[in-house]
Amino acid sequence: MSEENKTSNDNEQPTGRGGQNQPAILINTQYIKDLSLEIPHAPEIFKEIKSAPEVQINVEVGYQTLENNFYNVELKLNMDGDVNHQKLFILELTYSAVVALNVPAEHLEPVLMIEIPRLIFPFARNVVTNCLVEGGLPPFMINPIDFVTMYNNRKTGK
C-alpha cells in the first residue's frame, strides 16, 4: 500500500487587506451593553394576562470603528407589550459584539450592518426571552429579522 500526500487549497481562508490568510469575520466578544425591563403596572397587571400580549418591536443597528480592522456592532431592541390596552412591559436591550473583519472595503458596511447583526441576533433574542420569563412574564419569541431589508431601507432613506 502506498500513501499519497495530497494538498488542497480548498480550505484556505481568503486573503484580505492584511495580506495574510485570516478569517473574514472574527467575533471577539459579545456582551450586553444595556438591559432594562419595566413592568409599570405590576402586580395588578398579572391578573389581566389571559392571552398573548400585543408587542411592538423597534430594531436599530449601528457600529463604530475601534482600531485597525476592529469594530463594535450594536443591535438595539426596544419592545413594548400591552394587554387590554395597558402597558404590560417595556424592555430595552443593546446587545453588542466586538469583531475583527478582513473583508474588502466595498463589503465593509454590508457586513457590519447585515451579517454581524444576523450572527448575534439569536443571542440577543435569547437574552430577551430569558429576561421576560425571569421577570414573571410569558415567554415571547422574536421572529427572525430581515437585516437586508433594514439596510436597504436605511440606504434609500425609508
Label each residue range with its predicted role:
Residues 2-119, 123-158:
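N-terminal intrinsically disordered, cationic/polar leader segments
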